[in-house]
């Protein structure tokens, strides 16, 4: 075969399942991926399925994407489509490590076997089975969200569409994200009900990557976090 598609044998093919066929996918530096790759990931995130040679393959019911992103001012990055950003439940700014954490990193570099120990420290071990995860997710259905709190969530999301400094506000997916995430936060806090404080605590992580500021406000140095904080201060909180 001379590697031309029209003369190569085409009767011997097998699906080679790549890294996307998993329950938890870590996509490192997602904004360095070209548009075609981002489009394929978007389908996986939206449909929990991928299409290869016109055949659709289902992914794990627990398929979840964790992604890191480089600051946009770095060279070699691509803007993420708004539709793709909207598929992410939360966006969390990691920041730099504190002094104690960075000191531990420095200590690991001491000794002749430092490279090996650093690699060993990065080994990931399973901490929960998929069946246990399914059970935990089921418990979230028992977390109560009062009608007043649901109304507060809707008011916050719709408020982003009415704020002068915001060009594009959050869509209905943000409302869904609030319901999911606040229930999880309540469970982690040992409560069986969601409070308005849960909504406030998750407002920036849920809304931050879904909002687009007007250019004139960006030039003035206004940040999305500041706009969200002002919005929370303006909206009446249910008792």
Where are these regions (language model features)?
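Conserved alpha-helical scaffold flanking the Walker A/P-loop in AAA+ ATPase domains
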Residues: 8-26
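Short, small-residue-biased leader/transition segments that mark boundaries at the very start
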Residues: 1-9
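Canonical AAA+ ATPase core
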Residues: 6, 33-37, 45-128, 133-143, ...
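C-terminal engagement/docking regions of AAA+ P-loop ATPases
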Residues: 159-239
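Walker B catalytic acidic pair
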Residues: 28-29, 40
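Residue-level signature of catalytic and energy-coupling elements of molecular machines
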Residues: 41, 88, 153, 182, ...
């Amino acid at each position: 075969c001379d590697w031309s598609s029209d003369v190569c044998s085409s009767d011997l093919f097998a699906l080679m399942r790549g890294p996307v066929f998993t329950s938890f996918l870590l996509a490192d530096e997602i904004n360095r991926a070209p548009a075609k790759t981002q489009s394929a990931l978007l389908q996986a995130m939206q449909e929990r399925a991928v299409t290869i040679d016109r055949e659709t393959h289902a992914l794990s019911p627990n398929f979840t994407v964790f992604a890191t992103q480089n600051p946009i001012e770095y060279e070699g990055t691509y803007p993420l489509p708004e539709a793709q950003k909207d598929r992410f439940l939360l966006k969390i700014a990691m920041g730099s490590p504190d002094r104690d954490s960075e000191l531990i990193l420095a200590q690991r570099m001491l000794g002749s076997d430092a490279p090996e120990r650093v690699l060993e420290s990065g080994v990931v071990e399973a901490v929960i089975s998929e069946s246990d995860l399914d059970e935990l997710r089921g418990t979230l259905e028992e977390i109560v969200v009062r009608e007043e709190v649901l109304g507060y969530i809707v008011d916050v999301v719709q408020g982003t569409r009415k704020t002068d400094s915001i060009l594009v506000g959050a869509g209905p997916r943000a409302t869904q994200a609030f319901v999911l995430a606040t229930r999880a936060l309540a469970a982690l806090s040992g409560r069986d009900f969601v409070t308005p404080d849960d909504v406030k605590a998750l407002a920036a992580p849920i809304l931050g990557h879904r909002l687009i500021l007007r250019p004139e406000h960006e030039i003035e140095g206004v940040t999305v976090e500041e706009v969200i904080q002002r919005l929370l201060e303006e909206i009446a909180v249910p008792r």
